[in-house]
Design a protein with these regions (language model features):
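Conserved ABC ATPase "signature" region
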Residues: 67-74, 126-145, 254-255
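ABC ATPase NBD Q-loop/coupling interface
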Residues: 13, 67-85, 123, 194, ...
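Short catalytic/signature loops enriched in Gly
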Residues: 141-145, 235-324
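A short, proline-enriched helix->beta-strand linker immediately N-terminal to the Walker B motif
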Residues: 169-173
Length: 324
């Protein structure tokens, strides 16, 4: 197994109290596999990714339990200099806001090339040639002419391709893409997702795709983990999720996607708001918003029930959800 996250717990200590951002998250990604992690803002999906990468803000963040096994090594037991050697070379991350992630006063070629000068000891000339090669690989037109340009001279979609090029530079075994299509036009979103999928297949990387949009993962992911209030509430192969969700939250996410084949249908919206992570409701955190909630949901935290050999749902009424 390439990556295994086991019972991970992360909290943030603030003046107002302790926010439990990640509560017992477990998932895995193998070589050549794509896992989509879905959930609303504040669900813990990005915090989990930051913990995997070792870029969590500590303090106020703190990993309070669990294991993160990468190629059999527990990353949480490594020193910072050992983590740094893995970061970039073995695993890399694509952030959601390319403009703020790129240095505005350095050319894109210099920023891509820096990975080779720092990690591979290349000369600047050779690093620039590698930068051009990578820009070609991520389908940036006229890469040789544009390698000296600055981030503001590229469109949003092209900047995101530069971020992908930087993530691919050292040919890592795992890439984490955190909302890589945020703020992009729908057509550009599709192009970026297609590019990621093509590169993942070509290089046999593991890919974790973090998103709140079920619509962008249908043709890319192999399996899905749905998160809510710091917990995983459903995991399944992507086709099973789309065919029939086994958790009311997943069902709500699917029904809230606009569809062209259902003209005149009122667009569904999940009632209420995600909980305050400093005051998570007792029992199932989704119970105040759930149409199926019963007394047991308000008192007992549901485990991940086995729906099938490849599927789990943290809902006492997963059978009713499937049949609904």
């Amino acid at each position: 197994m390439l990556l295994e996250v086991r019972d991970l717990h992360v909290e943030f200590r603030t003046r107002d109290g302790v926010a439990k951002a990640v509560n017992g998250v477990s998932y895995s990604v193998d070589e050549g596999e794509t896992l989509a992690v879905l959930g609303e803002s504040g669900s813990g999906k990005s915090v989990t990714a930051q913990a995997i990468m070792g870029i969590l803000d500590i303090p106020p963040g703190k990993i309070t339990g669990g294991e993160i096994l990468f190629q059999g090594t527990d990353l949480l037991g490594l020193k910072e200099d050992e983590r740094r050697k893995i970061r970039g070379a073995k695993m890399a991350m694509i952030f959601q806001d390319a403009l703020s992630s790129l240095n505005p006063v350095l050319s894109v070629g210099a920023q891509i090339g820096e990975l080779f000068t720092v990690h591979r000891g290349m000369s600047r000339k050779d690093a620039k040639a590698k930068a051009v090669e990578l820009m070609d690989r991520v389908r940036i037109p006229a890469a040789k002419e544009r390698v000296g340009q600055y981030p503001h001279q590229f469109s949003g979609g092209m900047r995101q391709r530069i971020m992908i090029a930087m993530a691919l530079a050292l040919e890592p075994d795992l890439i984490i893409a955190d909302e890589p299509t945020t703020a992009l036009d729908v057509t550009v979103q599709a192009q970026v997702m297609e590019l990621l999928a093509d590169l993942q297949r070509e290089l046999r990387m593991g890919l974790i795709l973090i998103t709140h949009d079920l619509g962008v993962v249908a043709d890319v992911a192999d399996k899905i983990a749905v998160m809510y209030a710091g917990r995983i509430v459903e995991t399944a192969p992507v086709r099973e999720i789309y065919k029939a969700p086994a958790h009311p939250y997943t069902k709500g996410l699917l029904e809230s996607i606009p569809r062209l084949d259902q003209k005149g249908r009122e667009l569904y919206a999940i009632k209420g708001l995600p909980p305050n992570l400093m005051h998570i409701p007792p029992g199932c955190a989704f119970n105040p918003r759930c149409p199926l909630a019963q007394d047991v949901c308000r008192t007992d935290v549901p485990p991940l029930f086995e729906v099938s050999p490849t599927r789990r749902s943290a809902c006492y009424f997963w059978k009713e959800t499937l049949d609904a």
